[in-house]
């Protein structure tokens, strides 16, 4: 049957309330904080936090990050890099002498991928890498692909 008494109330009148005579429910029997993860709390760590301790894999000495820096941009996002008012002017322009030049390195991209469509408007795109598909679509639109270091 449910009772209105909490469990602590049941211990009243029994001196140490279930916490012993010597220790008296003091101090830190399991250590402080996260102590003992590799020792007396190991079963808990192994069960609930597998892989918390230890290392995996190999280290890469003298790694030069710029060899692996290759942020990509799809063709469908290429025109969004041009400010809106200039974009409208380029797309509606009939003057073939004025074409946009998009240099991707200062914008934080190094490779152009071929996903998506671009309008049949010539443009110059400068980047370190181009996929074959991206290069094909840009040149078909009348544009130029420029590789930069």
Swiss-Prot record:
InterPro entries: Ribosomal_uL15, Ribosomal_uL15/eL18, Ribosomal_uL15/eL18_sf, Ribosomal_uL15_CS. It holds the Pfam family Ribosomal_L27A. One of its GO terms (molecular function) is structural constituent of ribosome. It comes from the Eukaryota. One of its GO terms (biological process) is translation. Gene3D superfamilies: 3.100.10.10. One of its GO terms (cellular component) is cytosolic large ribosomal subunit. Belongs to the universal ribosomal protein uL15 family. This is Large ribosomal subunit protein uL15. It comes from Blumeria hordei. The lineage of its organism: Eukaryota, Fungi, Dikarya, Ascomycota, Pezizomycotina.
